[in-house]
Amino acid sequence: MSNEKEYWLFFDTNVLFQLYDKKADFNSFSFNSTFENVCDMLSQLDIYERVSVGIPKVVWNEMTQQIIEAHATRVLEFGSYIKKWKFPEYRVTTCDIEDYPNYIKSVVERYKEELEKGLIKITELSLPSASRFQSVMERAFSKLPPFGGKEKNSDKGFKDVLIWESILEFTAQHENANIIFYTKDKGYKDVLVDEFEKLYPNASIAILSAENEIKTVLEEWAKSIDEYSYQPIGEENDVDPFAEWVESPNFVVQLIDHDYGLIPQSALVAETIFKLVDYE
């Protein structure tokens, strides 16, 4: 195990999921805009080479199943709807793709490949191994966190446990890791953090639920990684360097007095008056 600090950001399904109720493209697959926003933060802070993004296998599987189920529902609704209306200007035809689940699974795999080609390192966080089975069962039967809450009777609690156990098993091999777990589930947050810290005192985890919280921690990481080049998100582009130079007291002096090495200034003019009217 390396002693070098590692930085990891893990996503929960409820952060990345797409809504398929009012508008949807069932030809493609992608995470929602939140994923892009967080990746943009890593790029703006220039820490994309140090911070890795982990997508649990549970998340991939769950989101794939979500689009399959949404497609099955919407295609039936659409078929029923178009039977009620006929227009001479429009003709609706069907395409036989035989098996939508297999079709979309191949689309998901291509999306994974696209992410892997990007600047940011994207890793799939494996399901917990057989060695974690006993822990998973104990949580299930005893309703220990992250089981419980309003949805304790659904399979959601079980999926939450799989993700959490995946993170714990991952940290066993990365004991110096600094981890962000981005999830909309706020229940048992303190309990889970306490469990994590007792198991891995050299590692750290922040369980966060909002983009502004992610931004704050990523900025802290960026400052820790390189204090001298650290630039908070949003400040880098606040000031236009050209505008700053034009508005500085030295602008006129530098513009007039600059010697381009062509003709001595003294041979051209004895006195110069310069007034800046406007600039774009």
Predicted regions and their residues:
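Active-site-proximal, substrate-binding regions of enzyme catalytic domains
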Residues: S2-A177, G187-E280
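Short beta-strand/turn micro-motifs composed of small residues
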Residues: T183-D185
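Short aromatic-hydrophobic micro-motifs that form the base-stacking/packing surface
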Residues: I180
